[in-house]
Amino acid sequence: EVDMIVRGSHLMSQIMPEAISHNLETKLQESGVNLIFNSEVKEMNKSENGYVLKTDQGEAYNAQLVLAAIGILPNIALAKKAKVETNIGICIDENCQTNIEDVYAIGDCAEADGVVQAYLEPIRRQVKALASHTYGDSTERFKVLPTLIKTKTPSLSIMLSPPLHATHGQWELNMNVGESQRLHYTVDGEVSGFALSGEFVTSANKLYKELL
């Protein structure tokens, strides 16, 4: 028996459209997962049989094993002490350089154009930009782009490229065949992101290239 405590109103609410989230939720529930939405763990204590988790809704759950999948937050404490410019993360330019000469940042802690991208693809491009700049070559420069994300959910294949700034647009269902869905995120009629599930994930790379 598995209880999954979810802070939002649906799974991966920050990057995934509700339509695909709901299909994934159905698949997980069919597998015996109990989903608890709009709830957040505030306290965890050891018990004789494992752990007791208490939520902000006043609920308590007993568990033998606890797995935290709550994301990451850049640790900028050291950078602040060193007078490096920070915001959400450590601020970098197109060469991955900070405001201090010869001090660089890449990876989960780096912020470019107000965005922290804690994914493998942008980190790989940051490494190329940093290496290029170090060797005096300016051909490789880091640019914040939408990233392609593959979720590791065996019950439902999902690939998506969420918009960088999801504030003025909306998710629209583009195609629906059985359990497979394709949604586009549009802003003033222009596609700036997509989400695919089921059989449609095979077209992810093609759509991603078109998006860029």
Task: List PLM regions with ranges.
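Structural motif
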Residues: 47, 99, 187-188
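Feature captures the FAD/FMN-dependent oxidoreductase FAD-binding
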Residues: 43-49
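FAD-site-proximal beta/loop scaffold in flavoenzymes
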Residues: 52-54, 60-132
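A short, polar/charged loop-to-alpha-helix boundary motif
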Residues: 200-212
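Mid-to-C-terminal Rossmann-like scaffold of FAD/NAD(P)H-dependent oxidoreductases
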Residues: 109-203
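Rossmann-like dinucleotide-binding cores of NAD(P)H-dependent redox enzymes
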Residues: 1-43, 123, 141-150
